[in-house]
Amino acid sequence: VGHPLIERLGELQPRTADEAHAREGSPPTLLVLPGSRRSEIARLSEDFGGAIMQVRAAMGPVEVVLPVADGREMEVRSAIAGWPIHPTLVHGEAEKFAAFRRARAALAASGTVTLELALSGVPMVVAYKVSKLEEQLKYLIDVPSIVLPNLILGENAIPEFLQKECTPEALA
């Protein structure tokens, strides 16, 4: 019994001191992971774009890297077209994990990627939005968190923002 990510632990190593020092003088890297489903990308992109702008206003320049799930590039490009900052899109697992090693922080949709980020040592904020109909199901489900690492830890160590709580201000 286990999780398939255990087999990939070698790829999920936190960045080394050498990698951290090599990036000195460069703007910090912010990973943006809006999900792999069309509905996730559509529901989260506006709030993620607003959060990026607030982070940039508070911290100055940031390098934004957005790993694109297989088959979702068109949806992602459409969803981020209105963002005033243009993220670097990366494809495939190798590029995604390389971006993890460069990242200072991540803004992520809830899902398996939160476990990948945790195993990689990347601090994150997690967001999720569902349809009004799906939101009604919350009354049938009793879980303390939607973030896999929080469930594993048994505590809410990673901030999560759902539905109306998912705003650019909260995410930034």
Positions of PLM-derived features:
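Nucleotide-activated sugar donor-binding and catalytic core shared by glycosyltransferases
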Residues: V1-A172
